[in-house]
A protein has these predicted regions:
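Basic/aromatic recognition patch in beta-strand/loop cores that engages polyanionic ligands
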Residues: 37, 47-78
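Enriched for short, Lys/Arg-rich terminal
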Residues: 67, 72-107
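Short proline/glycine- and basic residue-enriched helix-capping loop/turn segments at helix->loop/beta transitions
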Residues: 41-44
Length: 107
């Protein structure tokens, strides 16, 4: 399936890299590359991962180290929604994401 990465997931990966880079810039680069590689693996066989109905319809997740890769499975695309540290309140973060106001339409 085609792989898509949400803007929020891109921000998550950047924040993870920035955090790791404070102590180890080389590892930060290699770890963020590993996260992207994991996303590619998910896109190859998305249905083997755990369903997460409490997060939304067609949502699944995959652990990678201490991080949780949360993604949706669409007709022709696997969309990475968030990459979050496992200690975070995943349900609350998804509720906030769903409650975010839609941007206004362009004139």
């Amino acid at each position: 399936m085609r792989l898509g990465i949400s803007p929020q997931a891109e921000q998550d990966i950047e924040a993870i890299g920035d955090y790791i880079a404070q102590d180890n810039p080389v590892r930060a680069l290699s770890f963020t590359e590993e996260l992207y590689q994991q996303c590619l693996l998910i896109a190859e066989s998305p249905v083997i991962y755990r369903e997460r109905p409490e997060l939304g319809q067609s949502i699944r997740s995959c652990a990678y180290g201490r991080y949780l890769n949360v993604f949706s499975v669409l007709d022709t695309e696997v969309r990475i929604e968030r990459l979050l540290h496992g200690s975070r309140d995943i349900i609350r973060l998804f509720t906030e994401l769903d409650a975010a106001p839609e941007p206004p339409d362009s004139p």
